[in-house]
UniProtKB/Swiss-Prot annotation:
Subcellular location: Cytoplasm
Assembly and binders: Homohexamer. Forms an RuvA(8)-RuvB(12)-Holliday junction (HJ) complex. HJ DNA is sandwiched between 2 RuvA tetramers; dsDNA enters through RuvA and exits via RuvB. An RuvB hexamer assembles on each DNA strand where it exits the tetramer. Each RuvB hexamer is contacted by two RuvA subunits (via domain III) on 2 adjacent RuvB subunits; this complex drives branch migration. In the full resolvosome a probable DNA-RuvA(4)-RuvB(12)-RuvC(2) complex forms which resolves the HJ.
Enzyme class (EC, first level): hydrolase
Name this polypeptide is given: Holliday junction branch migration complex subunit RuvB
Family: Belongs to the RuvB family.
Binding site for DNA: R291, R310, R315
UniProt KW Hydrolase keyword: yes
GO cellular component: cytoplasm; Holliday junction resolvase complex
Amino acid sequence: MTDRIVGAAKREEDELERSLRPQVLSDFVGQARARENLAVFIEAARTRAEALDHVLFAGPPGLGKTTLAQIVARELGVNFRATSGPVISKAGDLAALLTNLEPRDVLFIDEIHRLSPAVEEILYPAMEDFQLDLIIGEGPGARSVRIELAPFTLIGATTRTGLLTTPLRDRFGIPVRLHFYEVAELEGIVRRGASVLGVAMTPDGAHEIARRARGTPRVAGRLLRRVRDFASVEGVKSIDAKAADKALQRLEVDELGLDALDHRYLRCIAVSFSGGPVGVETIAASLSEPRDAIEEIIEPYLIQQGLVNRTPRGRTLTPAAFAHIGVALPAGRSGEPGQARLFDGDEENGSA
């Protein structure tokens, strides 16, 4: 599951290709509203020589939350310190990070929704008043110590906004929601990446990669690197649509960006369960995949593409899903997504 080339989760190779990341806000492609607003807030903070208000980046994985956080620090001309929610296991870990920050530095916490409640409690006064309240000692001899902190900017990133506690969420003065990218935006990202990597690419080659990238820059960059590998070995001088399509077919990434696992999921419901409805536990058992992987990794993109419906009775495939995988609609299924006729004579009776 973690080896999917179209998966949006971070992989080691994604971290190695840092040269593909934009370094300044003007080079960042997509998320126009977020970029424009951030540019205003950054300029205002610079003009006043103040720390930027705390920022929360929310959205699906792979859309550029970490990259944007690094750009914000670079545009502000301050240091950038990065960590993640699961790494900060106790209050002392957070205190060590905060006390080492210089004035107006940026502290980036990825997966901030995974902070423990004890660490969150320490974070509240640090965010609001730039003060750290720590308990020193145990039992009757315990005492509270208040530490003054340099003004700083906390940038949090989360893929699960609903898991953030209300007190923590409300302390971010600049909430930014990132959305999936349009194909045209991803084409720009692919062209820029090809230029950085020194790869010759035609416009239709960039389009072929972009339209299969599932609206996610991280996936686009990964597909670009793999297509480059095929082109290099096969002696292709310039990657056009034909070369890109050939490479992506060998990677089992189809024209919608679906991979072999997506096709297994769709065929499981279409063939084994006549298009549904079928429960997620049954699907998980049939595919030998954990339920959370089905719900959080496989299904979101299929639902976004209008191929799957989640209903109270279970998962159903839409007619578009049957058409995409080349399986005929079961008898009795209507043309409406996720609906079935109760009786064969429904249409004749005007109750389809």
